[in-house]
Amino acid sequence: MADKKGSTGEKLLYCSFCGKSQHEVKKLIAGPSVFICDECIDLCNEIIRDEAAISEKEGGLAVKSDLPTPHEIRQSLDQYVIGQEQAKKILAVAVYNHYKRLKHLGKKDDVELSKSNILLIGPTGSGKTLLAQTLARLLNVPFVIADATTLTEAGYVGEDVENIIQKLLQNCNYEVDKAQRGIVYIDEIDKISRKSDNPSITRDVSGEGVQQALLKLVEGTMASVPPQGGRKHPNQDFLQVDTTNILFICGGAFDGLEKIIMQRSDKTGIGFGAEVQSKEERDVSEVLPQVEPEDLIKFGLIPELIGRLPVVATLAKLDEAALMEILVEPKNAIVKQYQKLLAMEGVELEIRPSGLTAIARKAIKRKTGARGLRSIVEHALMDVMYDLPNHKGVQKVVIDESTISDEGKPLLIYEEQPKVAGSN
């Protein structure tokens, strides 16, 4: 029964599920001839959450659809990343195999599949971070970017490596199961190389020490993370996160690695003359794909960490044609973004081919790659975007070579004013 008379004649209402009266619970919600209390609602929600977590664990990915194939992953990367065809292919296969492995966890088998973390080697602005971000968005898994240069050994001033896992948890609302299937991108991994091949009596707290700390995280460990972003202190309960199934992608420019590779392969001599240097710079894209573990060890990475990054993809330096394509082709191309911003003011933006060429050349001159394109376009449009809200009648903004190369002002095209009747 959902209701009956009390001793005072008051009509008492009861939960149809647990039988508690309206005085024993905070809230009683009525339905067609039934009632349910807030405690039973909480219990139902908990059961649903637990079942969803189990189902997600068995299914592997935190996505509803099936795992995309390497071809589908590559096609998605093509929409956002221009060029770097071989790197995209390597990444597509590695990521597909990683999440395929997770989908089959727990199944009894004689063969245990190892995790294949990834090392991306390429110059600044070649698309390393964008590739990792696009992969995480496609797979709908938690993603975090960490800067290796801010990391230090535990106990020293700086970020502890376990802070990376804390940020990953924050990005998925502290759902541990989701975090344990996420992607971590560690940028500037080359900046924590050993300072020399010989052990030093002084502590290398931001070099080899950090590599050793990262090694545990990358190969798989139980990381202790303070709940909800609190600071670590004794007598505190920690969240335990197993990093065994987190995919780690490490990226770096590795400036000078090509010299080490060429020394090993004896294809060319190493010198300090300008001619030799220009030759080396010209051949970097051809030399980097020949990288071997021994080259990375000589560069300053510890052998154990290299062993935990078995998949190596190299990215080429972007040329003028690639940078021009990046400006206009991808889904979220920079030119499309600024066209949308100006369209909100009712103004059309046109960047002529000569303007695109000038932007690409300036980025190459600055040695910033694709990363520098936005700042060049932003600088060219700064005054226009400042004045436009108060500037009536502008129909189109045009950027050409002179706007970029000579720091000239963009051309403003105004709407034709309607002629007043009777005027000459």
Curated annotation (Swiss-Prot):
Q: Which Pfam families match?
A: AAA_2, ClpB_D2-small, zf-C4_ClpX
What InterPro entries would the database entry show?
Answer: AAA+_ATPase, ATP-dep_Clp_protease_ClpX, ATPase_AAA_core, Clp_ATPase_C, Clp_protease_ATP-bd_su_ClpX, ClpX_bact, P-loop_NTPase, Znf_CppX_C4
| Keyword field contains Nucleotide-binding | yes
Q: From the Swiss-Prot or TrEMBL record, what is one GO molecular function term?
A: ATP binding
- Domain spans labelled ClpX-type ZB: 3-56
Keywords from UniProt, A to Z, are: ATP-binding, Chaperone, Metal-binding, Nucleotide-binding, Zinc
> Would the keyword NAD turn up in this protein's UniProt record?
no
Query: What GO terms fall under cellular component here?
Result: HslUV protease complex
Annotated PROSITE patterns: CLPX_ZB (PS51902)
Q: How would you summarize the oligomeric state and partners of this protein?
A: Component of the ClpX-ClpP complex. Forms a hexameric ring that, in the presence of ATP, binds to fourteen ClpP subunits assembled into a disk-like structure with a central cavity, resembling the structure of eukaryotic proteasomes.
The similarity annotation says: Belongs to the ClpX chaperone family.
Role this protein plays: ATP-dependent specificity component of the Clp protease. It directs the protease to specific substrates. Can perform chaperone functions in the absence of ClpP.
Give the protein name, as stated in the record. Answer: ATP-dependent Clp protease ATP-binding subunit ClpX
Q: Give the lineage.
A: Bacteria, Pseudomonadati, Pseudomonadota, Betaproteobacteria, Burkholderiales
